[in-house]
């Protein structure tokens, strides 16, 4: 298990040199964030990013994310040129030493929250999702959501939502299949594993189709193009926001198939109606048994990449919601502790945290 940490580049309030000081850190997960969606990332930019990361003694082997243009999801004629560009991005990432590319196929909205700074009883601030509040939102009036690279202007949002009114879940699956049949052969050719991130939260929102929500969706995904290069970013927090999703079972099934090149390990406190907030990583803080999840990774012989996911804002830290240093660092060290204990107390090879650099 290679423990990584997301970094948003030189504009990130969290310094790369600080991340390097986290015990057990292997590498950085990052991307080129200032190139418009659908355009090609210059290979020189990727190589420079790799050199910057390696300069502090870490690895850069996972990209998160290469955004998928809406015209691809909508199946519009422009998709062929955009898929060509996406394929070139896969090649360019491979040329810079990238092994895994995370991406998603969520229409319009990326990960969706109603609060960016919910105060918990201990005084920490966290991301939260109120199912009832979302049901009352009219997205056509214009909203800004965390996790976007940019937000739509109200008129742009209305236009793209109108386009999706005629796109059913099955039609979105057809568009995804077309996309996968184009990109997976390229990934195979250059030795990159694609890792689809599930929908977050794992349910339809604002009347938009969502197709990567549960076990059946994940199985359809990996069988659509049956290749080791067609994998999953198994995000415990995203899938875990639906109490029907058994994360331990998902890790055992898809990890046993060798289809989890990348995992997000975080906890989430979920209510029956789908309302949730993002808790500390510790099992007792949320709805997920993180120790059992880590053991499942161990039992399937997982040797891929994981990272702690969204953290709370603690100890007065400010910055990008969900992506501060302190709580994610605590999460990483906790996860490494679970991994070491699991390896030493379970049959199999002794625990080993991969060395950086």
Curated annotation (Swiss-Prot):
Keywords: Iron, Lyase, Manganese. One of its GO terms (molecular function) is ferrous iron binding. One of its GO terms (biological process) is D-glucuronate catabolic process. Pathway: Carbohydrate metabolism; pentose and glucuronate interconversion. Its cofactor is Fe(2+); Mn(2+). Coiled coil: none annotated. The keyword Transferase does not apply. It holds the Pfam family UxuA. Gene3D superfamilies: Divalent-metal-dependent TIM barrel enzymes. The keyword Manganese applies. InterPro entries: Man_deHydtase (IPR004628), Xyl_isomerase-like_sf (IPR036237). It catalyses: D-mannonate = 2-dehydro-3-deoxy-D-gluconate + H2O. Its EC number is 4.2.1.8. NCBIfam families: PRK03906.1, uxuA. HAMAP family: UxuA. This is Mannonate dehydratase. It comes from Sorangium cellulosum (strain So ce56) (Polyangium cellulosum (strain So ce56)). The gene is uxuA.
């Amino acid at each position: 298990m290679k423990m990584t940490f997301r970094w948003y580049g030189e504009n990130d309030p969290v310094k790369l040199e600080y991340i390097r000081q986290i015990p057990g850190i292997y590498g950085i997960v990052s991307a080129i964030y200032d190139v418009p969606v659908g355009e090609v990332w210059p290979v020189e930019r990727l190589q420079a990013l790799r050199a910057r990361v390696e300069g502090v003694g870490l690895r850069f082997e996972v990209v998160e994310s290469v955004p998928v243009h809406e015209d691809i999801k909508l199946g519009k004629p422009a998709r062929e040129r955009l898929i060509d560009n996406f394929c070139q991005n896969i090649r360019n990432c491979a040329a810079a030493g990238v092994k895994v590319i995370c991406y998603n196929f969520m229409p319009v909205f990326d990960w969706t929250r109603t609060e960016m700074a919910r105060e918990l009883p201990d005084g920490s601030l966290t991301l939260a999702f109120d199912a009832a509040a979302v049901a009352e939102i009219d997205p056509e009036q214009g909203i800004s959501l965390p996790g976007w690279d940019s937000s739509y202007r109200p008129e742009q949002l209305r236009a793209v939502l109108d386009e999706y009114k005629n796109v059913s879940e099955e039609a979105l699956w057809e568009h995804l299949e077309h996309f996968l049949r184009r990109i997976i052969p390229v990934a195979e050719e250059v030795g990159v594993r694609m890792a689809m991130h599930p929908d977050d939260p794992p349910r339809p929102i604002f009347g938009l189709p969502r197709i990567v929500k549960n076990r059946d969706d994940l199985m359809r995904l990996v069988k659509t193009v049956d290749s080791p290069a067609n994998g999953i970013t198994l995000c415990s927090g995203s899938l875990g926001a639906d109490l029907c999703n058994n994360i331990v079972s998902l890790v055992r099934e898809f990890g046993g198939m060798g289809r989890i090149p990348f995992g997000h390990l975080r906890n989430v406190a979920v209510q029956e109606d789908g309302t949730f907030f993002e808790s500390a990583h510790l099992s007792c803080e949320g709805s997920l048994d993180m120790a059992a999840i880590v053991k499942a990774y161990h039992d399937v012989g997982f040797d891929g990449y994981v990272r702690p996911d969204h953290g709370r804002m603690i100890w007065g830290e400010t910055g990008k919601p969900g992506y501060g240093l302190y709580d994610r660092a605590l999460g990483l060290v906790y996860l490494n502790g679970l991994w070491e204990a699991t390896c030493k107390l379970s049959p199999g090879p002794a625990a080993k945290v991969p060395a950086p650099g």
